[in-house]
């Protein structure tokens, strides 16, 4: 599952993998498209287990980098976090870090993707948004971007007591921004 970021209109959507490559293309709402690459850092594990535990509200072990083969044959890369009590069936969170296929992250690049109802948190990175959880199938999701990277954090709703509040997401976003390379 590829994830991409937000808009000035406080919108967010998930991207779709392009067959045969590690680039993810965000569905365009307008005429332009945004392309994102996975596996842009040695590790997507930008939060410690303790930091992810504070965000999720349950005890979580340190993350493990993982490759996933998508249905189209492309390979996705992310850091997976598991609840301390539960083993591999306790998958609780994921961080995926992406960067543009060319250039740097810009407002224009972020502007064409979105899901209605996202909350934009001002003053955190280039942009930080929290997706709404309005249906049982929705996962708590936060996206934060700086000029080089887009970090996507997804929590598994059935394995956490409740979605994080804005303050918890903001702490996690700031910790991620500090962990990203300059």
Regions found by a protein language model. Give the residues of each.
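Sec-dependent bacterial lipoprotein signal peptides
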Residues: 1-7
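Bacterial signal peptide processing site
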Residues: 7-13
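A small/polar (G/S/T-enriched), proline-flanked helix-loop surface module common
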Residues: 13-182
């Amino acid at each position: 599952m590829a994830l991409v970021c937000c808009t000035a209109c406080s919108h967010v959507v998930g991207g779709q993998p392009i067959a045969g490559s590690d680039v993810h293309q965000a569905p365009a709402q307008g005429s332009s498209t945004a392309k994102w690459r996975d596996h842009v850092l040695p590790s997507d594990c930008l939060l410690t287990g303790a930091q992810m535990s504070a965000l999720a509200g349950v005890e979580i072990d340190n993350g493990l980098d993982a490759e996933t083969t998508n249905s189209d044959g492309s390979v996705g890369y992310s850091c997976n976090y598991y609840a301390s009590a539960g083993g591999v069936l306790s998958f609780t969170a994921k961080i995926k870090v992406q960067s543009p296929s060319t250039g740097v992250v810009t407002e224009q690049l972020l502007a064409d993707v979105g899901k209605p109802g996202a909350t934009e948190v001002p003053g955190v990175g280039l942009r930080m948004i929290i997706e709404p959880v309005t249906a049982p199938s929705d996962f708590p999701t936060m996206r934060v971007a700086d000029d080089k990277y887009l970090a996507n954090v997804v929590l598994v709703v059935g394995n956490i007591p409740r979605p994080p509040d804005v303050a918890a997401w903001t702490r996690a976003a700031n910790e991620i921004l500090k962990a990203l390379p300059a």
